[in-house]
Every structure is written in C-alpha cells, then in structure tokens.
Amino acid sequence: MRKAGFLAFLLASSLGLAQGVVFLSTQLRPIEEAQKMRQVILKGFSGQVQFVPEDYPVWLNRVLAEAQTGRGTVGVLGGLHGDFPPLVSRGLLEPLDGLYARLQDRGFPQAFVELGRMGTPNQQYLPWMQATYVMVARKEALKYLPPGADLNALTYEDLKNWAKAIQEATGQRRLGFPAGPGGLIHRFLQGYLYPSYTGSQVRRFKSPEAEAMWRDFRELWRYVNPRSTAYEFMQEPLLSGEVWIAWDHTARLKDALVQRPQDFVAFPAPAGPKGRGFMPVVAGLAIPKTAPDKRAAEALVDYLTRPEVQLLTLKEVGFFPVVRVRYGEDLPEGIRLLAEAVSAQSSAKDALPSLLPVGLGDKGGEVNKVYRDAFTRIVLRGEEIRRALDLEAQNLARILRETGAPCWPPDAPSTGACPVE
C-alpha cells in the first residue's frame, strides 16, 4: 500500500508540470463541488489548472514530501486557517507580501489579512473564501429596535433592549438561539460572546470580564424564547414566526431567506466591550516554496480572489466572498441578504475573528461540552457564576493539557498547551 502511494506521488509529480498549476486543496472535496470548481469556477483562468482536492493528511504529507525532496509540483495550496500551521512552523510557504500589495485594493477584511500572517511578520496565505454565523430578523421586529440603534452595528445591550421591547409589546419572548442538542450554541459562546466581552476564547475563560459576560447573558435570556433549548436550525422557528430574531450558521438560516426573502433582514452579530466577536470559517490560498512556477501560481491566486470569481464561487459552492463585491441581480435575493450580512460582519471596524478550536484531535467535542455545560449551569440552572466558571475552567484546562493544543485566535499564541488563566 505504501509503495502504491509512493508511485502515485511520483506519477503526480511527473504530471504536475504538464498540467499547468497544480492546485492542492482540502476544500471543495465532494464530487459535485470539485466538478463545479473544475468546470465552472476555474474555466475563466487563462492558464491550465489541475485541481486536486484531498483529505488533510494526504494534503499535508504531499507538501512535506515535496519539501523533503526539494522538487515540487504543487503550485497553489487551498486550506482552512487551521491547516497551515505545520507548514508555517517549518518555513515551507512562500511569503505573499508582494502579491498582497498588488491585490489589497480588492478590499480583503483587515481581520482576515492579519489571520493570514499566522503570527509571523509575513503574509503566509491570502484569504480565499469564508463561511460563518450571522443574525436574521423578521421585518415586524424592526419597529421595536431601540432608538438610535444601527442594525449593522448593534451592541449586546441593544439586542437585550430590542428583545425586551418586543416582549413588552407582544407578551412573547421572540429572540431565539439554537440551544437544542444538535444546535450550535457552543459556537456562539466560543466565537461571539466570549471574544466580544473578554477578547479571548480560552485564556480569559474564568476572568472577571467573563463573569460580567455571563451576568449579561443571563439577563438577556429573560427575553429568549424558552423553546430555544430544543431548537437546532433557527430557519424553522423564524419561518413559523415563533422567533423574530435569531443567531445561527448561514447554512441553518438559508431556507428562511431563500423561501421568503421579502420577510427577513440579515445583519452582523452584536459587539461587546472588546469588539464584534465572530467565528469565520476562513479558507486561504498559499504558495509552497517548492512551487515550480511561482508566477503562474500567483496568477491563479489573483484569479480566485477577483470579485467576479468570488461571486461565482458563492453561486456555485456556497462559500462567501472575502473581497469587496457588488451583489448582482442574478444572485437569489435570500442569498444576497446573507452575503451582505457576512461581508458587513467581517469588514466591520471592530471585527474580532475567533477561530474554531484547533489542535484538539478527537477531544473537540469535550471542549464544546465545557462551554455548553457552563451555559446550562449559569443561564438555565441559575448557579453561582464564579463557582460554575471555576469548575468548568478545570475541565477545560485538563483537556488542553491532555492534547497539548496551543492557543488559537483571538488568544495570544502560547508555547505548549493554551493556559486557562
């Protein structure tokens, strides 16, 4: 089996130069997405491209093998932010500062550009595409917005006052979160609430700022629909009218906006004292130092980040743009509403991206459970905040010690396991 794998690698190496730029990607692996990439998205590129989607271990091992031999065939790498650290730590990526300087007028979100430096002085990757979580409201909720509140620049205080006004006027708790067993409330806590209040996801887990955050969220929960503990996809209660305002992943909100775009608005998540925390799933484009034709590789990165190609990517495979674009009439109205909210969130002046937990192996679910358990203890059961945080911080610290996972953004880098301070 190993021999067959090595022969396949040699064959890929021999074919690489003949096929133009070899584009090795951990993203768009499903057959349908890969076909759309080859037949539609890459069709307008002036050169030849061989799009090779692979699972992460195969992707990583191929790049490491080419670096070891000093003979590369791969021209461009596509991957999630969390795919690149092993390559950055070994110094295997070509700095893209010059390419970014040429393309920066496309309006890449500064928060994503900073992520692409991977904690180094140089641009390790350029943003390629994103998925994320936003908020959606039924239009009848808008008349209850607090005076002076800007829908695209809400604070958590605004959200509380908005939900409170709706309850006082209608007698109903119309704010909703996906806190059911299959819901993504843990991503809200990790990527939205914690960064917005503490500037951290892990280090400041039990900090005084975290205590204040939980007090505020417990107060907000007074205006949240009690059925939220059963919700998994917020598009359903939004469509039924059971909920008027909701937070969720774009894929779990999409049906409501596509079915009845005239009834809804989409907008960024609120900001807290430390900024507008949000959790993007960021994919980037990098060039390995062993790339056989760096000029052709740069041309492909240039092509994939053009506004019109970014829009094509959204239409064909559902990933949102990471450059400034103008959404046209050919885009379904509901998708356009979501896309505009995604763009507004990532390009906000106070945007504070918080990444999915990385380096946890098969213990990612245990970390998610820590956040969900803290929520259950503090918000649903009303336990004393300090005691609950101290207990759950012990669980979080234990998992991080066991995995040795270093800190990830927005937390500052760590040597060894990320500490719970």
Model-found features: residue ranges?
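Short, solvent-exposed loop/beta-turn-alpha elements that line the ligand-binding surface or hinge
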Residues: 98-108, 151-152, 194-213, 258-259, ...
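Extracytoplasmic "Venus flytrap"/periplasmic binding protein-like
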Residues: 21-22, 39-108, 144-146, 244-245, ...
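Glycine-centered hinge/linker elements that transmit conformational signals in sensory
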Residues: 160-166, 199-231, 257
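Extracytoplasmic/periplasmic solute-binding protein
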Residues: 116-129, 133, 157-202, 243
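Hinge/lid segment of periplasmic solute-binding proteins
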Residues: 80-134, 157-160, 265-267
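Long, aromatic- and glycine/proline-rich binding clefts that accommodate carbohydrate-like moieties
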Residues: 315-373, 377, 405-421
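Extracytoplasmic "Venus flytrap"
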Residues: 20-37, 362-363
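Extracytoplasmic/periplasmic substrate-binding proteins
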Residues: 188, 215-293, 419
